[in-house]
A protein has these predicted regions:
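Charged, low-complexity intrinsically disordered segments
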Residues: 2-184
Length: 184
């Protein structure tokens, strides 16, 4: 499954055609960060991709998404250390149903610093991601199509701050900056 699914309505809607247009340029003018990307780098950079890492303050996590959710709840749930894939969404729903409040702080500088640290730990801990980053030059995009709603979702502008982190780690992988420069 590459993400190039045929829509069930059998109709080429404008939203679906926009999605197909983006897919046609994947790995030509951008790397799509998505579990269905045609590039292994795009798959590995997706937040739910299993690539265990250790954060010195928070410990071990299987995925970036698990860490992200762990730090976003007022009462951190240990399950986020190991839960993967779509089970992460189910764990989030359970936490909310149990009254555990989720803090919305994606624009918070401390949150973004923590995510930057975590992305660095994830990539430095996975030689395959690091190597592929060193060999890549294309910019990153994040988009998908919701078939049931006939909705093309492009989160690239919203996630630019995260792509900037990937770009900085890519500079490290390509020898353009030092680890010390990356951390500051």
């Amino acid at each position: 499954n590459t993400g190039h699914e045929i829509i069930t309505q059998g109709t080429m809607t404008p939203n679906y055609m926009e999605y197909e247009k983006m897919l046609a340029t994947e790995n030509v003018d951008h790397i799509r960060i998505n579990s269905k990307s045609t590039t292994s780098l795009g798959v590995m950079l997706e937040a739910r991709y299993v690539s265990a890492f250790y954060h010195p303050k928070y410990g071990m996590f299987a995925t970036l998404s698990g860490f992200w959710n762990f730090i976003s709840f007022e009462q951190p749930e240990e399950a986020f250390r190991v839960v993967t894939g779509k089970d992460i969404h189910e764990q989030v729903a359970r936490c909310r149903a149990n009254g555990n409040k989720q803090v919305k702080f994606a624009d918070n500088a401390d949150f973004r610093r923590l995510i930057k640290e975590t992305v660095i730990y994830k990539i430095l801990g996975n030689s395959k991601i690091f190597e592929q980053l060193s060999e890549s030059v294309l910019p990153f995009r994040l988009y998908y199509y919701k078939n049931q709603q006939d909705e093309f979702v492009d989160k690239s502008a919203k996630e630019k701050w995260l792509f900037d982190i990937y770009e900085d780690v890519r500079k490290l992988a390509q020898g353009k900056i030092t680890l010390q420069q990356l951390l500051h």
